[in-house]
Amino acid sequence: MIKKIKELGQIIYLARKKNIPMRKKLMLYLCTMVMAGLGIVCLLLVLTRNLFGTHKQIQDVLQMQLDSSTAQMQEDLEQYTGYGLSLSGQISQNIDNQLKNNAKKLTDYNDDQEALIELQRQIYPEMNTTIQICRPSGVYAVLDATVNTKISGSEKSRSGLYLRLKNVTNTGNLMAETILFRGSPDIAREKELELHNRWNLEFNTDVMPGYHTLVDEKKRKGMSYFWSEKTSLTGTWEDVMFLCVPIIGNSGDIYGQCGVELNSMYFNQNYTAVDSKYGSMVTILAPVSDQILEVQKGMTGSTDGTWLQSVEDLKINHKKYYNEYFSGQGEFIGLQKEIQIPGEKENRWVVAVLLPKDKWQASVWRNRN
């Protein structure tokens, strides 16, 4: 195109050198302008086609990763839900048998340390089997009884067991090493478990997601389980999500709550950042509300190669090929897909795959040059 314009320039120059009538000169100028305009239009069409082609390529890359991450997330959560429901059934059966043999109710175990330790012994095998087989970062059971009702704050203190993996990243061992986060030190000694450095004897139900909902039949409203939003694990630097399942006896009595814990290390390990020619793609599981991706309430996979902060929500701007996500730290592009997660609140959850906008822009310009 540039060569043609140069040729037209030479023709105009020669026309000036010769005595060509004004009318022919005007026609020549007009043809030159038309040709130049057509050249510019063609150039813009080429650039636009390349740009749209790039957007479509990015959309395809994001969509492929989103489909993969969503399928994995759905499968993982369904698997842990199944194990949690099974654990609840096994624990309730153990408690039913224990109470029947002793002709007692669970409330009779208040202030009876030995009886509560025996209950923990009874439920330990099922809990240990669950954490060894499905390998969440933790498994827990809160029982609606306390070792001492006479101390201050006893109304929010509850007995139970809480086992955690000592090393979430070491999933290759046949038998994972576990530590005791909540429960009697007698259990730790008998099972040769190390006490967590933030160990406590009992649970604080005020900071245990879902407990006050699940043990209250009116509040529970028939919920068989739900997943919590991200919460800080008391006394640690870790963020976690809990599967919350009520423990219900044959008579319909509520014995407490159990489930699994998935911590931030679990998500980093299982949802790694994926490299692409447009930058690192990050997987996020989070609620969406009013065009806001509520990252602070969800969990984030590995953020290697990005500056994504899990403490800041992202505003969503829906575009033709992909979405734009904004925060005070910067911008991302990505796609999201709704996923069915029962929650204590009626949140709409999505799996999102994002990559830094500046990284893909740099990649596009680099490939053009």
Model-derived regions, located:
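Non-catalytic regulatory/interaction regions at protein termini and inter-domain linkers
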Residues: M1-R23
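Juxtamembrane extracytoplasmic/periplasmic/luminal helical "stalk" adjacent to the first N-terminal
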Residues: I20-E118, R135
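N-terminal membrane-entry
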Residues: L26-L30, V364-N369
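Short regulatory alpha-helical segment in sensory/regulatory domains of signaling proteins that mediates
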Residues: S92, Y124-C134, K219, T234-G235, ...
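Solvent-exposed, extracytoplasmic
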Residues: Q122-E126, Q257-M299
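GAF sensory/regulatory domain recognition
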Residues: L143-L195, P287-D290
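Extracytoplasmic/periplasmic ligand-binding sensor regions of membrane-associated signaling proteins
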Residues: L180-G259
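Extracellular/periplasmic juxtamembrane segments that couple receptor/chemosensory ectodomains to their
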Residues: E238-M241, I248-S251, G256-F267, S302-R368
